[in-house]
């Protein structure tokens, strides 16, 4: 064994051995229990960041732990390879997205391998490869024929200069991020998944996932947004015909307080009203600009304009004005909302702004309603009763809703209804670098799905986008085709699928990536569901919801038998670091990497010029704040095991990890000490196996701590997923071992047992060091998770606290099985008690078994 801890040599040798032996290749046929561990696959941006390192180390610890416990473990890796960043890089660098993507994949694969992850690389997949996306095209055609996928007009962000659709995040202050042009809202045809058909099952299925964080389940439940309310109509007359303006409300009890109705800018009533009203037409046009994101709508200034139209209140017959509101989304509900300013905070602010009537129709005993300012109780449906509502006065929420719904139903103007916030999933993207939608447009036959034998529709990989429109439209060899139904000349669909489609089923394809005759084979049911899924909380809603939805689609196609894709979910926190900047006269900030900054006596200065920089606080590592740490530089300096140990020790996995150079140094020091301890032990020669007999108390105490540590580390990793406390327990054990300096046979035997166990306990976290020292301690022996010796946990003696008159005065050690008289005698004989009793006879002795003795003097 070499004396020095040389991580680069140790890690290179270990990785070469794993590759040669195909150590981490998962067996499809095995009599061992399966454990499928999956971390969310990365976008191949070109470089790993510390967030990746943390994510994949968490997964690797769990995978390696279960392998040591005898499980048949699968931990695959792939690449979420389609998407907008590749197009942007292509525009900037003049290279095809495919070339950029494949080069990045090669580089990032090398980086992942350098970290020593126990990945089965034989299952590697990239979503941009035709042998992957052909099967989502196949599923698309199946679902299109069944009506689960359909086509309709949808509103998007349109850049009139670049002639392209923009994602919500590409709209900055109402302008296109690249062209700077004012963005328009435009209606275009798009394909949609009927995810709403599965809304109830997606909601109820959350109750079958005890291994998911409650926070994530709550976020999904809120996103699905099941609500029971009333769908009701406000009648009106238009051009001599009787029409109805429909709205949905969960607060039908406030219907008597409606003072106006607001419609979306895209609503037919708004368009009709704007025909002869230039001012309204301009406002409608303004509403149609900017983002269509719901989050943006929620935070923007609420604006409106009266259309001049009136509708009739369904119960009172009074006229109610119709306004256009920029906060009303056409894609939600009916594109119209009833406004009750007295009992809805948004409506209250809107009514105050435009001087609209506010009518109180809910009262709470002991509270006084005021028009001056909003009060929380105005919207309280639990304590409120109807007031100023005629026959509904004094009714509580449920009774009022029932009565009003019944009266509306009798008039044919309403009914109780369950509604979901969830909307169908629009997957059309006017992008080049994505999975082609397998539809052919024929003038005679309409939209025709591409037959299975003609799949995949292969995306040309030699395209260099220029940022203006979809380049596929300019490729005659791609667009021009023959209708599979009638044989006439036709055009191929040039939209591509939302990249969330690829990431919604990749976990299943890992089970059978080599299967060429279908989307999945029987191996999918062998491996699914995923036993442990790991990823960031930012994916709590969209990705995880879409993957759950896709799993049900595949189940209903007979491809999988299970209902849910991921049995257990761990959402790790961010990696954060200090930020530093300087600000110029114009307010522009220049950010400096923490490695280039020195802090002394509370003052941060730039190493390059010695001048001060502003400390910007701790934030998520990012390019924009220049506060990232390059994992490769960390590996080069300290080794992969140090990087892994620090990221697992610095914080519990679900919390943010604050970067600390001192913490990295500390992790490296621990590994050096561990190596030195093993080296010195091995150099001392072979260890003679203990013949038996009693051990002296210090060795018994160490063995007790060793087996307590084995017990704790197993529980911390498997059940609690608290890797930091597992590492801390091993460190405490090593500190205890360091205090043993004897070289007798018993001491050396216990030291050997302890170091062997430590090698295995740490192997999931620092696999290169763990395997290397285990090989020195037990040459040729396979690594297995150590068993807890129950006998070692039994204590011969226990320590009890000594109190005199309720105050702590010392401790005593007694035999573990000592009875009450023996404990009392030991307590009274102790020097501490004798001192405080000062010759007095105690009035009472109270023994709390296993904890303390209290002597009342």
UniProtKB/Swiss-Prot annotation:
GO terms for biological process: leucyl-tRNA aminoacylation. It catalyses: tRNA(Leu) + L-leucine + ATP = L-leucyl-tRNA(Leu) + AMP + diphosphate. GO terms for cellular component: cytosol. It holds the Pfam family tRNA-synt_1. Keywords: Aminoacyl-tRNA synthetase, ATP-binding, Cytoplasm, Ligase, Nucleotide-binding, Protein biosynthesis. It is found in: Cytoplasm. Its EC number is 6.1.1.4. GO terms for molecular function: aminoacyl-tRNA deacylase activity; ATP binding; leucine-tRNA ligase activity. A motif ('HIGH' region) lies at residues 42-52. A motif ('KMSKS' region) lies at residues 620-624. ATP binds at residue 623. InterPro entries: aa-tRNA-synth_I_CS, aa-tRNA-synth_Ia, Leu-tRNA-ligase, Leu_tRNA-synth_edit, M/V/L/I-tRNA-synth_anticd-bd, Methionyl/Leucyl_tRNA_Synth, Rossmann-like_a/b/a_fold, tRNAsynth_Ia_anticodon-bd. Belongs to the class-I aminoacyl-tRNA synthetase family. This is Leucine--tRNA ligase.
